[in-house]
């Protein structure tokens, strides 16, 4: 069975689920200690180490409203000391418990760290007329959802790059936040992070408290730039955001393509991705490269559309 994809250039490479998850856990948690990696793998919930045909039912513990259309959902793993073990830039597939319609299956990115014990968390936006997101927003504590995976979109390796630039919009922050958490929780990973995050108003900024804590705790390595296209009167002063969209000039001055050994990850609505990195391809294909990043001198090999 095929359950995981990992990037090889702009084309996906299919890996058997056991190899993919084991490799992903090793990549993320590599701290020079084989025993530490083995200990983590041994605690990883076995439901996230099986084939794609293996679906596991997890009960909802709680949910928290983050904005008018977005919630953080916390699901319980079977045992209190279980961990997800899911590597950065990976996601799970979810479907309503007891149903098998392919149209009801959706990918969701965990925002909890791989070593978080007992639970796994997701930030999910309610899409109008979206079957799965509507189902998620109808859940009550102790209701269950079926999950399978993980699917690895990009195989992250610690210290492969001196720095990464993250361009996100709206709920596209979730895989970028996942990557930030993975880097910053790994004492061996010294990668610097430059995040450009665009929204309409301050109320739409997801995980702002957590992002600001990253910047405060790792001020020498993390720089965050907020942009609001339709700010309210107090938004700019309260958030320190800039009015408008992520400016080409800001990327050029704060994250120039001339920086050696750097990489860019882009995630957001289709028009956002197209404007900055070119049209995204179907499924796991990267599609054409273009947009503002190409104009700034970045090459296709330096940019990944999450």
From Swiss-Prot:
Its cofactor is FAD. The lineage of its organism: Eukaryota, Fungi, Dikarya, Ascomycota, Saccharomycotina. Residues 53-157 form the FAD-binding FR-type domain. Its EC number is 1.6.2.2. Its main location: mitochondrion. PROSITE patterns: FAD_FR (PS51384). Keywords: FAD, Flavoprotein, Membrane, Mitochondrion, Mitochondrion outer membrane, NAD, Oxidoreductase, Transmembrane, Transmembrane helix. This is NADH-cytochrome b5 reductase 2-B. It is a single-pass membrane protein. One of its GO terms (cellular component) is mitochondrial outer membrane. It is found in: Mitochondrion outer membrane. It catalyses: 2 Fe(III)-[cytochrome b5] + NADH = 2 Fe(II)-[cytochrome b5] + NAD(+) + H(+). Pfam families: FAD_binding_6, NAD_binding_1. GO terms for molecular function: cytochrome-b5 reductase activity, acting on NAD(P)H. May mediate the reduction of outer membrane cytochrome b5. FAD binds at residues 160-195. Belongs to the flavoprotein pyridine nucleotide cytochrome reductase family. It comes from Vanderwaltozyma polyspora (strain ATCC 22028 / DSM 70294 / BCRC 21397 / CBS 2163 / NBRC 10782 / NRRL Y-8283 / UCD 57-17). The chain crosses the membrane at residues 12-32. It is an enzyme of class 1 (oxidoreductase). The keyword Transmembrane applies. One of its GO terms (biological process) is ergosterol biosynthetic process.
